[in-house]
Every structure is written in C-alpha cells, then in structure tokens.
Amino acid sequence: MSGPQDAGVDAITLRGVTHRFGDHLVVDDVDLTVAPGECFGLLGPNGAGKTTTIRLITTLLPVQQGEVLVFGTDVRRKPMVVRRLLGYVPQQLSIEGALTGRENVSWFARLFDVPRRERKDRVAEVLAMVNLDEAADRLAATYSGGMVRRLELAQALVNRPALLVLDEPTVGLDPVARDSVWARVAEMQQRYGMTVLLTTHYMEEAEALCDRVALMHQGAIQALGAPADLQAALGPGSSLEDVFRHYTGSSLTGNERGGLRDVRSTRRTARRLG
C-alpha cells in the first residue's frame, strides 16, 4: 500500500487551522506536520477538537481558516484527489449488518473504483490481513465488537491508501478486542509503511502505536513529541496522563487550559506491538 512519497513532502500539513461551530471555537490555530510512514496520534479528552481536526483533514468539514495539505495537495482545492489517498475509520459504525463481511468490503472496493478484475483478490487480501478470512461469509450482524472494528479496517484498506485515518479506533471495546485491533494496526503500518493518523483518549493506545503524539485540549495543541520523550522530559516514572496533566492542568477528562510546549523527538519510538 503506497502513495505519494515525494522527497520533502509531508503526509499531513496544518498551518494556522482554526474552526468554529457558530461562536464556539473547537480548533484553535493548529500547526502540525506528520511525516510519511509515521504513526501519529491526537491524544486528548472528549471535546478537545480531535475529531473536528481529522474531519478537516479528510475533507468532511470545510476549512474555514488556515491551510490543510495531504501529501502536498490542498484539501480545499482538490478534495477528490485527497479522498483517493485516504482510508478512514470513523467512530460511528460504518458496516451494514445485513451483508456479510466480504460483501461489506466488496461494496467499498466498488466505491473506490478498484478495478473489477482485481476486486475479488483485493477483498480477500484485506480480510486475511485483519484475520477475518474465516468469518468473511458470515453476516456482519453476528460479529463481535472487535471483529466489527477489524472489518472497518479492511474496508478502509481495500483502496490501498497512502494515509489511514482512525477516529477512536478501539472506543467501547473490551481489553482483548482492543489488543487485537492494536496488533492489526501496528502490523499493517509496519508491513506497508503507510502513514497512520489516529485520535484517542487512551494513553495506552498512544504508547502502543504512535511514533509521536500531540496532546490536544480545548482545541489547541498543548505538547507534541514521542511518548517516551514527553514522559522523560517530565521525569522518571511519568505516564502520558501525568504529562497531559502537567501541560494542561487537567486530566484526560478535564477541561482546564494549559500552555503550549513542544518536545522534539531525536529518534523514532520503538514499536510496542508487532
């Protein structure tokens, strides 16, 4: 799975991005770059602006102020080009329970104009990739929560995206199902070198998957860096929850505003899952 990898072109670029719903400021002057092949996380509580930010990146919301580029392409000027580069798993379930797993993925293959001669093999490939090949011909309504999430991953991967976007990919799942989804995401990211952008409020998820994270609170990025670097900068034994509280004055479910801090990584964080 590959996409635009031109030297010097970031996978995602946000410059001065601000978004309001009426008088309510939900994204506040965000600057951000994500490198090709990186797994990057937006970590923060509900209402932090994470989902709005990725909806701007995925063209699901109009950019009101600032600039959003995906592999150098402006989302406002060429939204259809950007959409062809993306695989997206939203928070809300995006499967049809009355169809089999295979039929669900096949529908997405047609939606993304996967060539007809390739569809059967491509669908089988991504179902096997997420360990659903043996359950592919069961109705999706019979799937567990973890299987549903893995099916959604297969749907998002069938067009071989350059950028995979995951909005709270394991919210509501039990620990076993959560670990299974984490393992599939890490395996696919490592195998194909695709860029992954995810939102989460689970610090364990950020630590398990992300090369770097941006801590978001009240629409703004409060700190940015590799999880290990952010923790080390605060002190031995610090967790990402501690880091978040330090920079924002709040917990991952709190709402008090903190200051901006940027901790740069000098190395890629080692994968915790493989």
Regions found by a protein language model. Name each.
Residues 224-225:
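ABC ATPase "signature
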Residues 179-192:
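Helical segment within the ABC ATPase nucleotide-binding domain
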Residues 164-167:
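Catalytic Walker B motif of ABC-type/P-loop ATPase nucleotide-binding domains
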Residues 160:
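Conserved catalytic motifs of ABC-family nucleotide-binding domains
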Residues 139-143:
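Conserved ABC ATPase signature
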Residues 106, 110, 117-135:
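Conserved ABC ATPase "signature" region
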